[in-house]
């Protein structure tokens, strides 16, 4: 299975995986409006991959089969103040 991966023109580190290049027919319109113009990053052979960067490859495959798309959001940002307080042993 080969899928197309697009990055968002509006949201940093946000990617949309679809089963066919330039086929956004299964992606909800509100999501596409929020996503902005999809910019093709790569065509990805999922059947040859065992791992992806931050996405769970089994979840990507499953959502592509069930929903027709997979949306990868950026990882949560670390709260540096909370981390510093934890390092100092200060609890909230």
Swiss-Prot record:
Record-linked Gene3D superfamilies: YcgL domain
Pfam families: YcgL
Coiled-coil region list: none
Annotated YcgL domain residues: 1-85
InterPro entries: YcgL-like_sf, YcgL_dom
HAMAP family linked to this entry: UPF0745 (MF_01866)
The protein, known as: YcgL domain-containing protein Sama_1929
Species of the source: Shewanella amazonensis (strain ATCC BAA-1098 / SB2B)
Higher taxonomy: Bacteria, Pseudomonadati, Pseudomonadota, Gammaproteobacteria, Alteromonadales
């Amino acid at each position: 299975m080969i899928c197309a991966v697009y990055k968002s023109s509006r949201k940093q580190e946000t990617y949309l995986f679809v089963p066919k290049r330039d086929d956004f027919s299964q992606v909800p319109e509100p999501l596409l409006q929020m996503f902005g113009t999809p910019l093709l990053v790569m065509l990805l052979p999922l059947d040859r991959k065992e791992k992806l960067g931050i996405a769970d490859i089994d979840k990507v495959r499953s959502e592509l089969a069930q929903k027709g798309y997979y949306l990868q959001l950026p990882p949560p940002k670390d709260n540096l103040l909370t981390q510093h307080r934890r390092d100092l042993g200060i609890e909230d």
